[in-house]
Regions:
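Transmembrane alpha-helices of multi-pass small-molecule transport proteins
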Residues: 24-70, 97-98, 150-157, 174-191
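Hydrophobic transmembrane alpha-helices of multi-pass small-molecule transport proteins
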Residues: 43, 110-130, 148, 184-185
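Hydrophobic/aromatic residues within transmembrane alpha-helices
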Residues: 21, 31, 78, 104-106, ...
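Specific transmembrane alpha-helical segments of multi-pass solute transporters/efflux pumps
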Residues: 10, 14-15, 44-91, 127, ...
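Membrane-interface helix termini and inter-helical loops of multi-pass transporters
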Residues: 16-28, 80, 126-139, 164, ...
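Structural signature of hydrophobic alpha-helical transmembrane segments
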Residues: 20-38, 76-94, 139-150, 202-212
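C-terminal transmembrane-helix exit sites in multi-pass transporters
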Residues: 42-51, 75, 94-116
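Glycine-/small-residue-enriched transmembrane alpha-helix faces in small-molecule transporters
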Residues: 1-30, 133-160, 182-186
Length: 218
């Protein structure tokens, strides 16, 4: 329980730190690259290939690329359109997406009640901002929901892999973050803006915190 509380606090700070000091000032793709790159370095000593097939390693990397690489890219872009509090509010749909995607991947009967709940939540988001709804708002909302969905796909994929192709969790996380790092490198070279690099010690410090502490240790 203590570890869960500590992790929750670290993640709570990470949202505010990025929104206050990095969003709009530092290129979001570079921020993702540094965050997952540093986290990958934390887990690098646990990287093992022995006993794992190339397909298994590739699947763990693919899941990591989706859950962390693509998810961070989408959520970091969303900060340009939403406030930190709005972004946090709109992440409440993630458990619903996890349930729905798990049903689909498990070939179970889809629980439409959860799908309807997700739809109501989106409508509710519009009502909350009914007097200030703009194209920017809807763009941000869409980015957060896509981020939620990619995170949910990764969560379900990881659970399925641990059931069908198990490996020690610290080893799995090493491949996980390596996959996220590779997709972040590609995104940075294709879409990144080299003119918006960190300019202050504080910005670099926050990136180190996000990568080593929030993602690596947390």
């Amino acid at each position: 329980m203590a570890l869960l509380i500590i992790t929750t606090i670290l993640w709570a700070f990470s949202f505010s730190f990025y929104g206050e000091y990095l969003a709009g000032h530092v290129d979001s793709y570079f921020a993702v690259l540094v965050r997952v790159g540093l986290a990958a370095l934390v887990f690098l000593p646990f990287l093992r290939t022995r006993g794992n097939s190339l397909k298994t390693v590739g699947l763990y990397m693919l899941v990591g690329a989706m859950q962390l690489g693509v998810m961070y890219m989408l959520s970091f872009r969303a900060y340009l359109y939403l406030t930190v509090s709005e972004l946090l509010l709109f992440t409440v749909l993630t458990p619903l997406y996890i349930t729905l995607i798990y049903d689909i991947m498990s070939k179970r009967r889809l629980r439409w009640g959860y799908a309807f709940s997700a739809l109501l939540a989106v409508i509710g988001a519009g009502i909350i901002r009914y007097d200030q709804v703009t194209d920017h708002f809807w763009t941000g909302l869409l980015l957060v929901q896509l981020s939620n969905i990619t995170f949910a796909i990764g969560m379900v994929g990881y659970k399925r892999l641990m059931e069908t192709r198990p490996m020690p969790q610290h080893n799995a996380f090493a491949w996980f973050y390596l996959g996220a790092f590779l997709v972040a490198v590609i995104a940075w070279f294709l879409l990144g803006n080299a003119q918006k690099m960190p300019q202050t010690t504080l910005q670099w410090g926050i990136l180190v915190f996000l990568g080593v502490v929030a993602s690596g240790i947390g």
